[in-house]
Amino acid sequence: WTDTPMYIRNRDGGVIRWDFYGGNLLGVRKKLKYLKSLGVSIIYFNPIFESPSCHKYDTSDYEKIDPMFGTNEEFEELCSEAEALGIKIILDGVFSHTGSDSRYFNMYNNYKEIGAYQSLQSPYYRWYRFSDYPNLYDCWWGFGNMPNVDELNPSYLEYIISGKNSIVKRWIRAGASG
């Protein structure tokens, strides 16, 4: 706990291993009464969706809590107990970009679905902006592991916001307050 978190890069500059620090949903759940006694009324989580990195801003799957934090069911239990104590749970939804190692982009073929990087026929292809397919694409601050999405693409909007089972609606139903 006294050393600086680190990561190891490959020859091309890609991160191949991260150090991880921190707690999980069960740990927060165990401390809810204590947090309430301090006057806490809102808990804001940085990204907790499935992701290969320690910062979790390169989402792999918006439908799953990252296993290092717990499960979707544990998230629901946390929200239920927090609500009973008058504490709201707020999620950091990173919807301007995904991870290159995601079910949507799937650069490394780690997912069953055909990602935008793998095929022009992918249902996710139009979510991204390629300048020279497949290797050149718009990405967050030039970080290739975080390809930007076209936030106004109709199918992306439906998946994230407006669809009956959109990501936002799913997590609100699971107990998040925002």
Per-segment meaning from a language model:
Residues 1-41, 48-174:
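Substrate-binding/active-site clefts of carbohydrate-active enzymes
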Residues 177:
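Receiver (REC) domain switch/active-site residues of two-component response regulators
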